[in-house]
Amino acid sequence: MRTHDDTWDIRTSVGATAVMVAAARAVETSKPEPLIRDPYARMLVTNANAGVIWEAMLDQEMVAKVEAIDAETAATVEHMRSYQAVRTNFFDTYFADAVAAGIRQVVILASGLDSRAYRLDWPAGTTVYEIDQPQVLAYKSATLAENGVTPAAERREVAIDLRQDWPSALRAAGFDPSARTAWLAEGLLMYLPAEAQDRLFTQIGELSCAGSRIAAETAGNHADERREQMRERFRKVAQTLGLEQTIDVHELIYHDPDRAPLGQWLNEHGWRANAQNACDEMHRVGRWVEGVPMADDKQAYSDFVTAERL
């Protein structure tokens, strides 16, 4: 059960979800024609010791094993992996467009095991700020450093919970509010109460000059129903395969029916926003997977929101 002041490392609570996402990136990277390439994802997963079920996600044969038990769950596993690749690609492209427009200041909120500071081609003079729990940032930077991996940009850690005074910590790390910034909130908002989400974007607005950009992933209105269907199927399959589930992602999420649609909120608070539905984006890049629950309901899937400060 979440509390207002809970903390975590890479093996527990919200921190462990970063391992799951990194596992999906690792699987995608190993494909013959990957949509994205994250050469550090597998390393970050295997060194985390976050639980058997997360490492099992690295298994290329996992979908076939699950399919032998339940075809719809197998499709859902493949869809989840594909979704993570599409989401990563969308936001990689967002950053590429931002730096092409001359932006040299980047902030990744709740960065988890995001390795963009290491794997993307950043122009000279780019600074990437990563905000997350201290133990999560420490694990990532230590693991990569121990394996001889160095950042491709100036990387600065801001080790603080987003429920604390992170704007002051960000400024103390060298952030310049007068410079255009590209912000990212990927895989974050579902773990915040509605009030905290509004406060977060209010704070971002206060730190963003005209021409700054933001990108975020938001859940659809019917996402809870789809997640519940997936949860029950995953639980049954995990039991059959003998995989222990160390966390229940469903219990980490804030189920807030009054959460304001992010695109609308941004348009009303000094930004010009657009939203791309995840289903449409998966179809656009040829990575949609058939046979998943609620496939005909776009509101059961995420939106990728991008906006520019006016």
Curated annotation (Swiss-Prot):
Pfam families hit by this protein: LCM (PF04072)
Keyword tags: Methyltransferase, S-adenosyl-L-methionine, Transferase
E.C. code: 2.1.1.-
Top EC category: transferase
Example GO molecular function: methyltransferase activity
Binding site for S-adenosyl-L-methionine: 132, 161-162
One of the GO BP terms on file: methylation
InterPro entries in the record: Ppm1/Ppm2/Tcmp (IPR007213), SAM-dependent_MTases_sf (IPR029063), SAM_mthyl_Trfase_ML2640-like (IPR011610)
UniProt-listed Gene3D superfamilies: Vaccinia Virus protein VP39
Record's function text: Exhibits S-adenosyl-L-methionine-dependent methyltransferase activity.
Assigned protein family: Belongs to the UPF0677 family.
Official protein name in the record: Putative S-adenosyl-L-methionine-dependent methyltransferase MUL_4762
UniProt lineage: Bacteria, Bacillati, Actinomycetota, Actinomycetes, Mycobacteriales
